[in-house]
Amino acid sequence: SYDYKPELSKQQGKSLPAAVKPDIFFGKVGLLRGSDWEFRQRGESGLWVSEMFPEIARRADMLTVIRSMVSDSANHTPALFVSNSGFQANGFPSLGSWLSFGLGSETESLPAYVVLPDARGGPNGGASNWSSGFLPGEHQAVILRGGDQPVRDLFPATPISKLAERESLSLLQLLNKKHLASSGQDQQLLARIRSYELAGRMQLSVPEVSDYSAEPESIREAYGLQDPVTEDMGRRCLLGRRLLERGVRFVQLFSGGPIAGSPRASWDAHESVKDNHTLEANRIDRPVAALLDDLQRRGMLEDTLVLFTTEFGRTPFAQSDADKVGPGRDHNRYGFSCWMAGGGVRPGSAFGETDEVGWKAVKDPVSWNDFHATIMHLFGVDHRKLTFYHNGIQRRLTNVAGNVVKGILA
């Protein structure tokens, strides 16, 4: 979508020139398959973006595209884990948790880290994608959902009077203090107490932040709230902006639910790239573009970093028999694109290159460790110095690797 390869279209129907059979998830290497979407140069920058995302394409001058991302895995769950935490195994803190731990919160009434999942379900690996791992529990993400109850069980099932609630909370606070003192300031207990105290404050903040009635009709229209195709992502993008305005440090939106099913409710286009990606792109294109416009209009884009990522890309060859050009594509961890916009990156630019057909990164490959190190740098944090002692090791988000990608910095 962001890496134009005219040579791929020219070589449509030919075999991938490779001495060794490609290492891919399902192992079926069909013939090369050109893009289903037209590419054009966009804006003053001339950045190449395909018609898959027509609205985002019109904001090309805001984007900083990395075309040479590489991952450690071509399997959804470990690939998601490494993109979120830097490790293929679960149990490690996510990027949002590290930022919460390192920078703290800018608000007492909302969490520092919020996740807004797709209405169709969560990603592979579930909550491990936004886990606080071995960091203190208060740095775990809080999930907000659409509908009348963004946070489950935030209010009592049976309403009680204000007086009864106040007296109950006072007693609970007293008991918590005594229990904490007797435990020797146990960190897990302290995190649980803080989480429940935050939940009490969220009884006021969550209904307010999730109420869009004060938003102008033009804003709701821009985000696509009246269109059933874009409504879910539109609501979440708008909620994300409202959360950022109120001091939430890191907001993470997921596009796509579980990978199983037919038709798939995710981007996992093994059967048909054109059919699948058209449906999924239509759900998010308009809301994401509206979010970029809204942040810029409000003067927020200068100090907000927008990340548009995927755990891996798709192969330039079809997922089919060796002599066919099938409609689907397999997973590609060797070279794919992500983009950033906003705080501290160079707008209207592209960094890195894949080979002539978009199979592997050949210039300035960027690992997830590099990607995370760069994000930390943009937040004013040295990724090598933000550590937490666990199980005999000073752990960090980037493990023992990671270099800041200076070529994308403004």
Where do the protein language model's features map onto the residues?
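Ligand-binding pockets and gating/stacking loops
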Residues: 1-410
